[in-house]
Amino acid sequence: MQTGEYNDAIAILLMRTVTGILFFFQGYDKLFNVKIANVVRTFSEPLSKFRISPSFLKPSIALSSVIELVCGILLFIGLGKNISLYFLAIDLIFVAFIFSSMKAMWDMQYFFPRLLLIVILLFCLPEQDLFSLDNLLNFSIKVGQ
């Protein structure tokens, strides 16, 4: 294996684990530290102008938080990378709508880095992600055949 291939694999590992950690703690904080009710309270006022009721907002934020928590863990360990990235991309669309109701979209300093990490990881080929459970399981399936 060439040095460049290891560098690619390590770069993907770094991006995948950092992205996983970011989303994991984002979901964890909303679920266990800040609590969903407080997050709903924060967004209820700005979203009231769109006539979005808290009864819709609460399960939406809870689902978003669970997606961030679970997909963050999966990205961190490298299991189900693509499906996790798809769920997180959909989650970011929801987050973009919620946050853009509060302030201008271009002022969302935390949104765009996460979006960029997801897009870059989606461009990475699975066979380049050497240090992941997906790769390990795929290798063991191929060896067993």
Enumerate the language-model features and the residues they cover.
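Extended, low-polarity transmembrane helix blocks
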Residues: 1-38, 52-66, 70, 77-145
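Juxtamembrane inter-helical linkers in multi-pass membrane proteins
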Residues: 44-47
